[in-house]
Amino acid sequence: MAGLSHFDEAGRAHMVDVSDKPVTARVALARGEVRMSAATLALVTEGRADKGDVLGVARLAGIMAAKRTADLIPLCHPLPITKVALDLTPDPGLPGIVVEATVRTGGQTGVEMEALTAVSVACLTIYDMVKAVEKGMEITGIRLLLKDGGKSGRFEATP
């Protein structure tokens, strides 16, 4: 399967051998949104959710998820993550919460999956913490915005 590095010549899945790759600085930025009603957003931003600090708990969940990515995604390498930061921004225009995760490492492979996992789990945590109020929330737009470092260089998503 040409172009798909996680498959061998016979089409069997395998973990890519990165042992000959140089250690370089890597960074990835991912983004997602949790869309909800204006009333639910107010509940979150005013700290009135029954389960507590929605944004604080979601931030911690995203950080924890980034560190556990190799346990969740079968062919991801365990990496020495040097930074995970999550920004959770209320956006009345959605209405909802915009979640962005930045992940850094000095390693032989990138941290795109860690950033995407952090965003995904933070969004799921927001949903979990307020689903009693609104089950129709929508998790949307999860995507990689930026990756830099390594052989393939820099990628920036188009707006």
From Swiss-Prot:
Keywords: Lyase, Molybdenum cofactor biosynthesis. GO terms for biological process: Mo-molybdopterin cofactor biosynthetic process. One of its GO terms (molecular function) is cyclic pyranopterin monophosphate synthase activity. Substrate binds at L75, C76, H77, M113, E114. The active site is at D128. Homohexamer; trimer of dimers. This is Cyclic pyranopterin monophosphate synthase. It comes from Cereibacter sphaeroides (strain ATCC 17025 / ATH 2.4.3) (Rhodobacter sphaeroides). The gene is moaC.
